[in-house]
Each structure stands twice: as structure tokens, then as C-alpha cells.
Design a protein with these regions (language model features):
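Bacterial N-terminal signal peptides that target proteins for export
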Residues: 1-12
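Second-shell loop/turn segments in exported
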Residues: 74-85, 104-106, 175-183
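Surface-exposed short loop/turn segments
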Residues: 27, 100-160, 171-178
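A structural "domain/chain start" motif
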Residues: 22-88, 198-206
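C-terminal motif of bacterial Sec signal peptides marking the signal peptidase cleavage site
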Residues: 17-20
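Sec-exported extracytoplasmic/periplasmic mature domains
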Residues: 67, 91, 95-103, 126, ...
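Compositionally biased, intrinsically disordered linkers/stalks adjacent to structured regions
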Residues: 169, 177-206
Length: 206
């Protein structure tokens, strides 16, 4: 029985390896941002625009994260609940990053000095749990999931775009994503939330 299980396990690994390591690519413009014309390449998986005015804002309205990713009906990988959980996780990660150590206020109402944060998930690539537990596959990246997103900060009163980003990538080869389909996507979102906090801190001279 053990031999059968072992054969099945390694068979699944080799089959997935033979299929190659899927990585999230730039999904292109999703039509979510209010303006794409000022985006500039920061690195191979990151486009960004910064007006230089973010330091004037210390309060933030976080809109519900939009799910712009659409699965092919003939090949549904994620349940609706998994995608809804991903949206909630991203918003929570951003809220925690902004307010950590008494950083910034998350509010509900528009006002002077308040920016509105809009985030849309544009792609999700599933984590293959069976390929995420060995040293070899972690090094090669086999089984890594990922995600892509678009986001912007706009003045809550005027709608002026303050910052805009388009990001995509795969999960961590070090951190364990577990056996959930969205484990690596969540790791990425946690990282992106921390990057946002760092950008705001930098704008405030912290």
C-alpha cells in the first residue's frame, strides 16, 4: 500500500514537472485604473506611477478589493469561496500594513488629506501543494502559484491619481504556501501590502 501511495505521489510530481512551471505574466491593462498613461517600468514585474504628492495624505479609504480575474468555465480551478477569501485577505493585509505601529488611519469618509485606495486582482495562478514541499521543487519553482493586480491611490475629494501600480509574480521559494490553491497568491499580497506601506512611509519621510 505504501508503495502504491509513493508511486502515485511521485507520479503526480513528475507529471506536473513535465508540464512546466507556470508563472504569472503581465496580464495587460484590465481597464481598472483611472489612468494608465503615466505607468513606467520599475522592474520586470512592476509598473508604477508616483505623482510625488502622497506625503500630503495620512488617512486612507480602502475600497473592497475587486476580482477582475475570470476563470475559463471549462477549467475552473478555484471555488467562488476561495476567490472571495482572496479578496478579503488582500484588503485585510493592506489595512494591517497601513495601521501597524500606529502608522496611518483607515477611515470611511472622504475629506481633505484622505486618499482612496482601489485594488483589483487581475490574475491568479494556483499553488500545486504536492510540488511545494520538496527542496528540489522549491528551488526550481515548480508548483509555485501567483497573482497579478492593479491598484491606485486617488484623492478622495477630486479623484486625482496619486499613485498607480500594476504588479504580477509568483510566490516565495522560501515561505511555505501549504496545500491551498491560493497560498502563494496570499504570500504575494502580503508582500505587496508591505511595499505599499513602505512607499507611503517614504513619502512622509519616515
Amino acid at each position: 500500500m505504501i508503495r502504491v501511495i509513493r508511486a502515485f505521489f511521485f507520479g503526480a510530481i513528475f507529471s506536473a514537472l513535465a508540464a512546466g512551471c507556470a508563472t504569472v505574466q503581465n496580464p495587460g491593462q484590465a481597464g481598472f485604473l483611472s489612468d494608465y498613461s503615466k505607468l513606467m517600468e520599475k522592474d520586470e514585474n512592476h509598473l508604477v506611477y508616483d505623482s510625488g504628492n502622497l506625503g500630503n495624505y495620512s488617512k486612507f479609504i480602502i475600497e473592497p478589493v475587486a476580482m477582475l480575474y475570470r476563470q475559463p468555465e471549462e477549467k475552473r480551478i478555484f471555488t467562488d469561496k476561495e476567490l472571495e477569501d482572496l479578496q478579503a485577505h488582500f484588503k485585510s493585509a493592506v489595512s494591517e500594513a497601513l495601521t501597524e505601529d500606529g502608522g496611518y488611519q483607515v477611515v470611511e469618509a472622504s475629506a481633505s488629506g484622505t486618499a482612496r485606495l482601489r485594488i483589483g486582482i487581475t490574475d491568479v495562478d494556483d499553488t500545486i501543494g504536492a510540488l511545494n514541499i520538496t527542496i528540489y521543487t522549491k528551488i526550481t519553482g515548480a508548483g509555485l502559484g501567483g497573482a497579478a493586480m492593479e491598484g491606485e491611490l486617488v484623492d478622495s475629494m477630486t479623484g486625482e491619481q496619486l499613485v498607480a501600480v500594476s504588479r504580477w509574480g509568483s510566490g516565495s521559494r522560501i515561505l511555505r504556501a501549504g496545500f491551498t490553491h491560493t497560498g502563494d497568491a496570499k504570500i504575494l499580497m502580503n508582500r505587496w501590502a508591505k511595499d505599499l506601506r513602505e512607499r507611503i512611509d517614504e513619502a512622509h519621510g519616515r
